[in-house]
Amino acid sequence: MAEPRQEFDVMEDHAQGDYTLQDHEGDMEPGLKESPLQTPADDGSEEPGSETSDAKSTPTAEAEEAGIGDTSNLEDQAAGHVTQARMVSKGKDGTGPDDKKAKGADGKPGTKIATPRGAAPPGQKGQANATRIPAKTTPTPKTSPGTGESGKSGDRSGYSSPGSPGTPGSRSRTPSLPTPPTREPKKVAVVRTPPKSPSAAKSRLQAAPGPMPDLKNVKSKIGSTENLKHQPGGGKVQIINKKLDLSNVQSKCGSKDNIKHVPGGGSVQIVYKPVDLSKVTSKCGSLGNIHHKPGGGQVEVKSEKLDFKDRVQSKIGSLDNITHVPGGGNKKIETHKLTFRENAKAKTDHGAEIVYKSPVVSGDTSPRHLSNVSSTGSIDMVDSPQLATLADEVSASLAKQGL
């Protein structure tokens, strides 16, 4: 069964060592309302019932805590803060009965908190710190007063675990084992009051303003007041405006020698006289032909036809040979055909006579003898000298051919 969430505020008074537990909701189970706040005795001894309540938690509380907690990590983190909250110093003086007020009485700084789950009723404030001890925490023996004092001034539980509702931050007698740094439960905002310790009061007394310094005997820096009453003399300078006396001024050397000189250029007069052209004569011979008229305009160009037949004569001797016919045209070019058979002769003289009939048609149709072959086989070339040369050429060519 889920429990209603409870929020607690833990306020520490460093001057007196008291802790105040405040229940914001006031909803608790009936079985957990009676959890008295036990304080150590004057002689440093404790009541037997308080030791057992501090060392252990009820089985029902542990069982319910194991079933109600959200996550194991959040419970482990809350367990570390609970064990640290149980540390209480034993060297303080004075003990008293259970206190139902918001703060403990003066002279009872060492209060020990019981650890059943739940909180005090709404009417009881500061009666007990209702905390849940996880199953992992084990009770440890009490420590010396010095260690308790250091534990009280050391850690402070400023938040409650969201996984374990109704578990406020409180102090324990024994130091808790170091928890892993990765386990960070969700923090709940807790209002904390500033520590009220004698040291803070002393610091306030020391911060009080001291007596004001005497500023009448303060001396100035070296040489800073020597010219304190000095006034600048620039304002006493007077600028006097005097008129210049130009009566005795003399000119520069030679500047007044020609002061009355008048430039003579202005006396020149430009006289305009008309030119008399009546006596002007012309240039040499310019008036001799003044009435001359050019005769070019009187020349007439006549067009006459030329009669070449009547008047034209031939060049010298050009008509003497007008009927001459050149004689080159009467020459004839003869063509002779070479025949090897007709002009050939046998290598051996067999005594036969070669007769050749020319193809040219002529009046003499009788055959003629080209050559007279002697008994010795020689040819008579007296009749035709051209044929003799041809015969020699033919014979030479035949000899080469092997005929």
UniProtKB/Swiss-Prot annotation:
Residue location of crosslink Glycyl lysine isopeptide (Lys-Gly) (interchain with G-Cter in ubiquitin): 33, 216, 221, 229, 243, 260, 273, 279, 283, 293, 305, 309, 315, 331, 337, 347
An individual GO BP term: microtubule cytoskeleton organization
Positions of post-translational N6,N6-dimethyllysine modification: K125, K273
Ranges of biased composition (kind: Basic and acidic residues): 1-32, 90-106
Annotated region (Disordered), positions in chain: 1-219, 360-379
Residues recorded with modification Phosphotyrosine: Y19, Y159, Y356
Disulfide bond entries: C253-C284
Ranges annotated as biased composition (Low complexity): 136-147, 156-176
Subcellular location: Cytoplasm, Cytosol; Cell membrane; Cytoplasm, Cytoskeleton; Cell projection, Axon
N6-acetyllysine: residues bearing it: K125, K187, K221, K243, K252, K260, K273, K279, K283, K293, K305, K309, K331, K347
Biased composition annotated in UniProt, kind: Polar residues: 50-60, 363-378
A GO CC term attached to the entry: cytosol
Tau/MAP repeats, residue ranges: 206-236, 237-267, 268-298, 299-330
UniProt GO molecular function: microtubule binding
Tissue note: Expressed in neurons.
Residue numbers bearing the N-acetylalanine modification: A2
Comment, domains: The tau/MAP repeat binds to tubulin. Type I isoforms contain 3 repeats while type II isoforms contain 4 repeats.
UniProt subunit comment: Interacts with MARK1, MARK2, MARK3 and MARK4. Interacts with SQSTM1 when polyubiquitinated. Interacts with PSMC2 through SQSTM1. Interacts with FKBP4. Binds to CSNK1D. Interacts with SGK1. Interacts with PIN1. Interacts with LRRK2. Interacts with LRP1, leading to endocytosis; this interaction is reduced in the presence of LRPAP1/RAP.
Protein known as: Microtubule-associated protein tau
The gene coding this protein: MAPT
